[in-house]
A protein has these predicted regions:
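Cysteine-dependent hydrolase recognition
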Residues: 1-262
């Protein structure tokens, strides 16, 4: 890690490649909030939206499951900053919920999967099944459990979200990643998502994460335009962090100042 930090400081790196992602359930999935963030970023980082720079916005509904696409974007060389808005746990980035769809079969399968998740592993499955049938008015057949269904549900859960074991030996290449999520920055634990990004084989050297629950009614990208002015990431963090927010990695890293006259 220290070797790649020293190497990064020797570079003259512009903030000219930005990646932004939104997971399910974030800001109540309001399209107005998602659109408003894009407008705010354009105002703060105008050079990023001109010819020669790259900005990518990905919503959880862009793909299902989103996980392979997110990991592929994070592995791309040249990404300077990645902003990730989603729910989280110390060892998980929650990306997708159940598949959206207007078809009856999609809806029924989602309901069955939900019911199985409430019964499977319960200390009294039969009692729990009866409660769910009475509460939701669903057929008993929809609450069926089997080894094959348990395996299929487990594989789907694994495929929908980024788990910490997905990051072992996988390069995460954005220089800086912001995890606007609960618990991803739980540095007090033996492992957490934010630490796995910087200690992997990729180019990531600093992450911002939250050690406990994170607020959603906030402006997480506030003052981020300062990073294009050569301000160090730690100095930016001093002005925007809440009690639960932390930088993990090198707070002294900065991009070159593109706001200088000429």
């Amino acid at each position: 890690y220290l070797r790649k930090v020293v190497k990064a400081h020797a570079e003259q790196n512009e903030l000219d490649n930005l990646f932004v992602f939104r997971g399910h359930g974030y800001n109540s999935e309001a399209p107005e909030a998602w659109a408003g963030e894009q407008i705010a970023l354009r105002e703060q980082l105008p050079a990023l939206f001109r010819t020669g720079s790259t900005v990518r916005f990905y919503d959880f509904e862009s793909r299902w499951p989103m996980k392979p696409y997110l990991l592929e974007k994070m592995a791309r060389k040249g990404v300077d900053v990645a902003l990730c808005h989603h729910h989280g746990a110390p060892d998980t980035q929650y990306l997708n919920g159940y598949r959206n769809g207007s078809g009856m079969n999609v809806s029924i399968e989602n309901i069955k999967r939900f019911l199985r998740s409430k019964i499977d592993g319960h200390k009294d499955p039969e009692k729990r099944k009866a409660e769910l049938i009475a509460y939701y008015g669903v057929p008993e057949a929809w609450c069926q459990l089997s080894d094959s269904l348990h395996t299929a549900d487990s594989l789907l859960d694994q495929a929908m979200d980024v788990h910490i074991e997905d990051l072992y030996n996988r390069p995460m290449n954005p220089r800086m990643v912001m995890f606007d999520a609960c618990y991803n920055g739980s540095f007090h634990l033996d492992e957490c998502i934010a630490a796995s990004y910087i200690f992997g084989p990729g180019d990531c050297i600093v992450t911002q994460g939250n050690s406990v629950n994170a607020l959603q009614d906030k402006w997480p990208d506030r003052y981020i335009g300062l990073l294009d002015c050569g301000v160090r990431i730690g100095q930016w963090g001093r002005h925007v962090h809440y009690l639960e927010t932390h930088l993990i990695g090198d707070p002294t890293y900065r991009f070159i100042n593109r706001a200088l006259p000429g």
